[in-house]
């Protein structure tokens, strides 16, 4: 497993807490575990990758032994509660909670006792429990019955706690052993949410189930109506030190600094995109206030785009998640087959993202650019490149044009149709300018580039709703034969087509139901045109079905996987037939020889939702988009060279196993070899590394590398029509090489007469390498560099 990012596009955060020593910041995410770092938001590290569900509520308790790790209590809205005393290496469920179905509040008293209180729900009843042993066990201190109440605990060291109940506003100063009714609640209600400011008596704030905000300046004895609450998502808090400062959260943070006389939002959601470092992201799941070591207080604002802090009551804010808080919530990811450095991703509320650079290092984690806000999924491309990428937002189709400098286009959904929240779309496997949109009917969109207009046609007359409320929710074409197609509906019916999706035949039996938001996972085999898998809801029924007869019948293919949702299915790119399945909490693998699925997440990958998967064709790797911990790669064979028998990546007609570079179509066996420093013909040497005739000169510096008598150092022989010395011409025997030298003075020296040279005609001359050879050699080197 290898984590790939994003390093800078954080997703939803819920809660932040200081460690008791005040030096460490802990934060809980949505399905991304628990994190800790320095107070300024640097040096983030995950301590909850082995903890499913993330953390909506969080408290940190001092260890029993000084020097040991702090004790961390993490709880989810859905009732999962766990404790760790070893920095997240292990998590244990506390005793005494009786498997709650929900958690409304988790608080810690700060007076040194570290007493914990948790308000849980189960079977429609709410119960307040207490722990005095650092969260190892809890016991009941108050039963609220069917009333959905809330708890406020003093944050300055006082033992005071306040409980909203059907009997009224209750107060205890003895850790819940006894309770005093302070007064009635402001109105009759079935639920109340509570916050308070210790700067008052205290001042308490309550929001009822009727979305009305009330204020009490006498610890709950009397209440005054303040305002009607809109854009409210159950998030509220009040300042510890400023009695008039209170805020609630929804899409925005609504804030008052004068006790409710006036209200203002901190910033609009669209302000974030021009200034993410100093403007809040939209959607506020949490607001937290902590005292700091300087005697002031710090607000933490938990958003769908990471964690922020403020030292001035949210007049200004600072983003703590621009680096290292890797809790991206991705629906899908698409890596370009033309350039694996190009990766596009669709996120929950962090938009459509791209990256064009892979970081170096042992654990390369990518940074992404958000080029459009919103929620995007089902990224699809006809040829796997980014020249045309289609995806969906809940309301329109997004088209990315261009690999290097992408630009975006928007298309409408078909009118009067039904589909999941993020509808399934599939690129036409035979036309990069077309895609399919399954709904009650199947539609095909195609771009006419001559007039730059999109046409939308009803591709098939088949009504997949069968007159009811269902619709087509997953579609796949066979990579073996694009005329063969497979489809699933939201209620688990399966269909198959043999004419590219024009006509359909329903299968004899059912497939899994869909995920209401995203549809099913559907995978057509790249090895067998008749094999297809469909994954979906596996709660009480098999989550994966397989057909090996072209979709005529399906059978369960689920052995080894328990009750869970199957979000994604993928097939290894090496032709081995190995499969992976991404589920609600982990990843499973199944090889063709296996009789069951094997869980492979282990301890190296996070326990989270593995929403989608793609096969990386240039390496034997499956890339997962997770909903909470970003992008993760699972490598089948980490040491594999990346060459698989069934692949021809560069399209030069030579399979990867026979090609010396299957990413360059100009390099293949039989190609013309050039003096360019590249082995073009896979022999496996380049001309500047070959000396076939053994004359000491490589081919690129030798005018004939098949004849050892021909080289720049050879003796030129005139008149034989052979350029022995590679100067570009044969020597003419009648052409003097230079001015005739004077006869030697030494009379004893033999005279050389014309004709004494025998059969060489007296013209044999030995040339010593001169300046011209140096110039020729330098020119040859320069040419090689220019061509390299």
Residue ranges, per PLM feature:
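Beta-propeller blade termini and top-face loops
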Residues: 1-640
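Disulfide-rich extracellular modules and peptides
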Residues: 46, 93, 140, 181, ...
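Intrinsic disorder/low-complexity segments enriched in polar/small residues
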Residues: 67, 199, 291, 303, ...
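Extracellular calcium-associated, cysteine-rich motifs in secreted modular proteins
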Residues: 641-760
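Short, threonine-centered small-residue motifs that mark membrane-proximal processing/anchoring sites
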Residues: 760-770
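A cross-kingdom C-terminal cell-surface attachment/processing module
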Residues: 768-785
């Amino acid at each position: 497993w290898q984590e790939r990012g994003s390093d800078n596009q954080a997703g939803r955060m819920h809660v932040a807490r200081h460690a008791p020593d005040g030096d460490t910041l802990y934060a809980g995410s949505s399905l991304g575990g628990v994190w800790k770092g320095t107070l300024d938001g640097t040096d983030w590290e995950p301590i909850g990758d082995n903890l499913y569900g993330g953390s909506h509520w969080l408290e940190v308790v001092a260890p029993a032994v000084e020097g040991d790790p702090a004790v961390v209590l993490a709880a989810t809205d859905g009732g999962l509660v766990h404790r760790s005393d070893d920095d997240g290496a292990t998590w244990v469920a506390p005793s005494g909670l009786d498997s709650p179905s929900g958690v409304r509040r988790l608080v810690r008293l700060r007076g040194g006792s570290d007493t914990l209180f948790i308000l849980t729900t189960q079977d429609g009843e709410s119960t307040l429990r207490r722990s005095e042993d650092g969260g190892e066990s809890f016991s009941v201190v108050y039963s609220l019955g069917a009333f959905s109440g809330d708890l406020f605990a003093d944050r300055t060291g006082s033992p005071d706690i306040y409980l909203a109940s059907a009997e009224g506003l209750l107060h205890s100063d003895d850790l819940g052993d006894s309770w005093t009714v302070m007064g009635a609640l402001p109105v009759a209600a079935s639920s109340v949410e509570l916050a308070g400011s210790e700067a008052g008596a205290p001042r308490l704030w309550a929001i009822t189930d009727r979305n009305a905000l009330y204020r009490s300046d006498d610890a709950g004895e009397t209440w005054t109506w303040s305002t009607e609450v809109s854009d409210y998502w159950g998030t509220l808090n009040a300042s510890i030190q400023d009695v008039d400062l209170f805020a609630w959260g929804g899409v925005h943070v609504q804030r008052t600094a004068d006790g409710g006389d006036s209200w203002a939002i901190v910033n609009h959601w669209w302000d974030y995109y021009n200034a993410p470092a100093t403007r809040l992201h939209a959607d506020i799941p949490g607001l937290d206030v902590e005292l700091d070591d300087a005697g002031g207080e710090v607000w933490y604002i938990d958003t769908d785009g990471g964690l922020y802090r403020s030292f001035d009551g949210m007049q200004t804010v600072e983003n703590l998640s621009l680096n290292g808080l890797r809790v991206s919530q991705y629906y899908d990811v698409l890596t370009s087959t033309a350039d694996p450095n190009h990766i596009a991703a669709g996120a929950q509320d962090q938009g459509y993202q791209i990256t064009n650079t892979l970081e170096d290092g042992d654990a390369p984690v990518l940074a992404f650019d958000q080029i459009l806000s919103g929620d995007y999924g089902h990224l699809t491309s006809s040829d796997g490149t980014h020249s045309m990428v289609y995806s969906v937002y809940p309301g329109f189709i997004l088209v990315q044009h261009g690999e290097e400098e992408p630009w975006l286009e928007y298309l409408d959904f078909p009118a009067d149709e039904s589909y999941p929240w993020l509808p399934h779309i599939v690129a036409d496997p035979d036309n990069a300018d077309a895609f399919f949109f399954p709904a009650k009917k199947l539609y095909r969109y195609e771009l006419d580039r001559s007039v730059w207009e999109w046409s939308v046609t009803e591709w098939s007359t088949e009504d997949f709703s069968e007159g009811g409320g269902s619709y087509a929710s997953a579609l796949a074409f066979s990579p073996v034969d694009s005329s063969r197609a497979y489809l699933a509906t939201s209620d688990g019916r399966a269909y198959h087509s043999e004419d590219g999706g024009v006509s359909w035949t329903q299968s004899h039996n059912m497939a899994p139901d869909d995920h209401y938001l995203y549809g099913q996972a559907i995978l057509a085999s790249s090895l067998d045109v008749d094999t297809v898998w469909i994954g979906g809801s596996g709660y009480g029924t098999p989550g994966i079905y397989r057909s090996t007869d072209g979709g005529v019948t399906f059978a369960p293919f689920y052995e080894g996987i328990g009750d869970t949702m199957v979000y994604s299915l993928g097939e290894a790119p090496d032709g081995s037939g190995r499969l992976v399945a991404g589920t609600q909490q982990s990843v499973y693998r199944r090889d063709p020889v296996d009789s069951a699925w094997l869980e492979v997440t282990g301890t190296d990958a996070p326990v989270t939702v593995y929403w989608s998967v793609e096969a990386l064709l240039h390496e034997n790797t499956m890339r997962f988009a997770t909903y909470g911990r970003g992008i993760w790669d699972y490598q089948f064979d980490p040491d594999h060279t990346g060459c698989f028998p069934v692949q021809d990546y560069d399209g030069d007609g030579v399979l990867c196993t026979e090609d010396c570079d299957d990413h360059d179509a100009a390099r293949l066996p039989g190609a013309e070899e050039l003096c360019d420093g590249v082995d073009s013909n896979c022999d496996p040497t380049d001309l500047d590394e070959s000396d076939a005739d053994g004359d000491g000169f490589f081919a690129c510096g030798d005018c004939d590398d098949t004849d050892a008598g021909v080289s720049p150092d050879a003796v030129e022989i005139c008149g034989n029509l052979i350029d022995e010395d590679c100067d570009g011409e044969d020597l003419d025997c009648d052409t003097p090489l230079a001015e005739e030298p004077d006869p030697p003075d030494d009379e004893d020296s033999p005279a050389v007469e014309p004709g004494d040279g025998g059969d060489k005609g007296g013209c044999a001359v030995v040339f010593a390498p001169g300046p011209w050879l140096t110039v020729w050699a330098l020119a040859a080197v320069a040419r090689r560099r220019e061509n390299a």
